[in-house]
Amino acid sequence: MKIFLLTLTLFLTLNATSLTDDALKKMIGRMLVVGFPDATIDKESQIVKDMQKYNLGGVILFDKHFKDRNKTKNISSPQQLKQLTSDLNSFSPKALFISIDQEGGRVARLKPQYGFSKTPSALQVSHMSLKKSSNIYETQSEMLKDAGINMNFAPVVDLAINPKNRVIVGLERSYGSDISKVVAFSESMMKEQKLHNIISVLKHFPGHGSSLGDSHKGFVDVSQTWDSSELKPYKILIAKGEVDMIMTAHVFNSHIDKKYPATLSYSFNTELLRNQLNFKGLIISDDLQMGAISKHYTLAQRTSLAINAGVDILLFGNQLESVTVKKLVETIFKEVKLGNISIEKIRESNAKIENLHTKISIVQKPIIFTQKRQNLTKAYIKSHYELDVKDITIKPQTIVLHWTAVMDFQKSFERLNAELLFSDRADIAKASALNVSAHFLVDRDGTIYQLMPENWMARHVIGLNYSSIGVENVGGEANTKEDLTQAQLNANIRLVKYLKAKYPSIKNIIGHHEYREFEKSSLWLEKDSQYRTEKSDPGKKFMSDVRDALDK
């Protein structure tokens, strides 16, 4: 049996020469989030044609046109907006980021005059209790979710260092100058947005609260005002593993990069944010049509410098000026062909984008995991692996795919939910009373449910539990039929890619029926030589299809 090694090097090698021009343009399209002028759309709308031709990554919604504040752009009422976002999703061939600036206070696209709830500014919230802030952000998150928004360019984690700062401090967009307060209230918003499957985008890296200028209008130099303390909110939140996306600022700081503003700077985005702060998520630019950038760099320069600096998603709001998606794609495509942008960087950004879509699509449905079940798990580890452990955390190194042998989702869930083994599992009952479990359960329609933390041990495979993540699939009727669906296949592929990116320690992906191939490996810990069962799940064809897809 071939043990599948899911490594980035292999993936890139296999794909290095197989990319067509059309495929490349679609990958470029995935890296774009753009504004468009319509409050309603149909199949003839330009944004729909762009989504379908270029696999557009996302859109940003505004209530008004920047140059004509009396003219409605994308938002007029809750009902209208909900229909618009529904249509956007239905027309888009791939998962779409539908984004908005909804910080609260002065920066809020969903306003009471359109029928939405009012959200206080960050400064106002900072004078409240954390509990009150949670209630406020819960209400806002529900409003965003109901409207079909899945990405919010908030919270603002800029420190209010300069009282003369107009664009952040003057507009009450900062929670203040106290780092702990900024972190606490930012977490409050992020927590509520996460519960509603809304991506939080921290901004404006590396800090805009000390500036005197407005990057919307022109060049902003913070070389003499910026302080390293402005990095601390990012450092703290990144270390907690809570940050999926960060927006760059168009500020210039000669102490870090003597040539380029942060958005276009490798020193800021890769060396500082990626390498020093260890950020693994997505980097999105602030609007590349702002004066701080557009007045000094051509479109080709803006896009190529940003991508090479480490930016994954390019934002063009089409408020300050207008540019077509076709022109954006063709400009970047030309830069790639000229060798000014690496194809591998395009691939890497696309992989991160798809992984984030997978993450926000996962439904949380926890199984019962009381202290009793944890104690049973520790006893299992002691009995079968001869390890004394303080907790049940693991380092994932393998993903094992299964089927439940049950055709109904709820019955499959109930089989995994109980703490104690069911009476019909005589084949493994002597080994432990601990019930079987898995980290994920994939329904017939491809919906992924997370049942327990990925880094806790589940009982799902003999010998390898202590280093593996288990993925169960509803199906495999009576343990005889290879009947898992195409939707489940696609979901498993997406989930494997997401988990591998999250846990670089994962090197192997196997079917449950292949587990005995590991008996002589260092990962195998089972001490009972008689404790083995024969397995057929999730089917040889299913595993072959998964591997073929991962190889492409």
Question: PLM features: what roles do these ranges have?
Answer:
Residues 112, 140-225, 514-530:
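Surface-exposed loop and adjacent secondary-structure segments within mature catalytic domains
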Residues 364-461:
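N-terminal catalytic cores of peptidoglycan-degrading enzymes
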Residues 17-112, 311-316, 362-364, 394:
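N-terminal hydrophobic targeting/anchoring segments and the immediately downstream early-domain regions
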Residues 144, 366-374, 480-552:
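Basic/polar, cationic surfaces and motifs that engage anionic cell-wall
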Residues 42-46, 59, 71-91, 96, ...:
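Second-shell residues forming the walls of enzyme active-site clefts
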Residues 121-132, 170-192, 220-235, 528-552:
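Acidic, His- and aromatic-enriched active-site or binding-groove loops in soluble protein domains
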Residues 30-36, 57-61, 96-102, 151-155, ...:
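Hydrophobic faces of well-ordered beta-strands that scaffold small-molecule active sites
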Residues 3-13:
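Sec-dependent N-terminal signal peptides
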